[in-house]
């Protein structure tokens, strides 16, 4: 991978971390099954997503930190960052460029996937 490619991946990773950790730079979406949980449970799930750091080749093959999963009270929770065009109609042509990308972080049960 060229230095330019590495720089792009580093930018994508940073932008994904900003959204996941601080809610900056995109939308956070919860599926119905997550929204149906208590406020306390939702807060606990958000904290687990925010502090998630178990990234490895199996769940992060491109080093973008765009996916994670964990167990919560016997259920598997999954979160995923997706990249869209600014009008949200198509995929983003360049997820490293904020002017060309609208990010969403979706938090869901594995069974919602």
Residue ranges of predicted features:
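Compact soluble domain cores
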Residues: 7-70
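Short, compact, well-ordered microdomains
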Residues: 66-113
């Amino acid at each position: 991978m060229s230095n330019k490619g590495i720089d792009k991946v580093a930018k994508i990773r940073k932008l994904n971390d900003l959204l996941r950790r601080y809610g900056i730079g995109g939308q956070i979406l919860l599926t119905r099954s997550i929204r149906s949980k208590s406020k306390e449970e939702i807060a606990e799930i958000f904290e687990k997503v925010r502090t998630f750091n178990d990234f490895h080749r199996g769940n992060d093959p491109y080093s973008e930190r765009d996916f994670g999963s964990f167990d919560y009270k016997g259920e598997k929770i999954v979160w995923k960052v997706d990249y869209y065009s600014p009008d949200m109609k198509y995929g983003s042509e360049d997820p490293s460029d904020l002017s060309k990308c609208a990010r969403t972080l979706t938090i869901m049960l594995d069974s919602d996937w």
